[in-house]
């Protein structure tokens, strides 16, 4: 008798979740909501209202500087490379910075402007100073993504021949990057890191990781949740070894947080971005800046990479 392939009843659910996530990210970063809160200049009564309310997360982003070094943009859990498009678009408005190139780990190539853009040679990729990374699986755990970062950093250094790179990482992407610093081979330590900016990092784990560990299997984030949850062995290992990671960053490590949403964490619920409490971001020898937001939901954590106030703070660091 021929074998009958049985479908996993969860496959349809996972597909629906993935499609919903893609639609949400498209709206967040490219729809009217994303445009309203990102790099769009805030003028007139809008600027006055933002200033009066002290909503520093939405302060205007000044014209971008010329970037000092190539910038590597590392995404958070479930986030596509395009989540950095608002920031990249703003920085690219200074023509000296070039257009963004996306390193797609799955094919090991640079693509022009997006994951489906034309393939670039190393010489063509070297004309930009902005590099997004598209993981093979955006729901992967830090231990799965770290080897992919090794390949990406090698490729970017090979193309640019830059003595040092700057890094902007978001959410779990900060954990991915820290694990890269922790594990990268001695030969890769010649790839210098100058400035590092962490946006909404899970510095000491995140309660959302605990949730993912408990109920994340149907949507494929159980392993990531296990590694990112508060008190996980990976988080403890990285925090115990933070000094070694910090020493590999020649310049400053800047942590950006957003307030305005009730956020669960160690010790209960406090102020944060819905995922990360602002009182649990700090790390030794890093400078923490908290910007005031207005979204009382966890959507703030997803959207913050496109907030004009965040872009303003990031570009300050990239001009150092």
Put a short name on every predicted segment.
Residues 1-15:
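Short, compositionally biased, intrinsically disordered N-terminal export/targeting signals
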């Amino acid at each position: 008798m021929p074998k009958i392939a049985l479908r996993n009843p969860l496959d349809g659910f996972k597909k629906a979740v993935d499609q919903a996530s893609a639609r949400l990210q498209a709206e967040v970063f490219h729809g009217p909501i994303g445009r309203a809160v990102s790099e769009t200049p805030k003028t007139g009564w809008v600027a006055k209202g933002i200033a009066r309310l002290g909503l520093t997360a939405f302060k205007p982003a000044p014209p971008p500087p010329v970037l000092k070094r190539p910038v590597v943009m590392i995404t958070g859990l479930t986030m596509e490379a395009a989540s950095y498009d608002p920031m990249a678009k703003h920085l690219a408005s200074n023509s000296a910075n070039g257009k963004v190139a996306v390193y797609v780990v799955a094919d090991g190539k640079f693509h022009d402007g997006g994951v489906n853009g034309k393939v670039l040679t190393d010489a063509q990729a070297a004309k930009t100073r902005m590099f997004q990374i598209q993981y093979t699986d955006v729901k992967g755990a830090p231990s799965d993504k770290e080897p992919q970062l090794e390949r990406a950093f090698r490729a970017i250094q090979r193309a640019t021949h830059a003595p040092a790179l700057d890094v902007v990482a978001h959410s779990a992407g900060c954990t991915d990057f820290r694990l890269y610093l922790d594990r990268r081979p001695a030969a890769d330590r010649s790839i210098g890191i100058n400035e590092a900016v962490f946006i909404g990092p899970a510095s000491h784990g995140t309660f959302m990781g605990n949730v993912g560990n408990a109920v994340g299997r149907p949507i494929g984030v159980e392993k990531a949740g296990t590694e990112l949850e508060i008190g996980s062995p990976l988080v403890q290992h990285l925090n115990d070894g933070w000094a070694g990671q910090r020493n590999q960053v020649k310049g400053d490590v800047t942590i950006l947080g957003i307030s305005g949403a009730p956020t669960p964490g160690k010790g209960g619920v406090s102020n944060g971005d819905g995922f990360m409490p602002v009182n649990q971001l700090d790390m030794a020898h890093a400078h923490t800046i908290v910007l005031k937001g207005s979204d009382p939901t966890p959507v703030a954590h997803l959207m913050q990479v496109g907030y004009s106030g965040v872009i303003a703070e990031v570009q300050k660091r990239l001009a150092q």
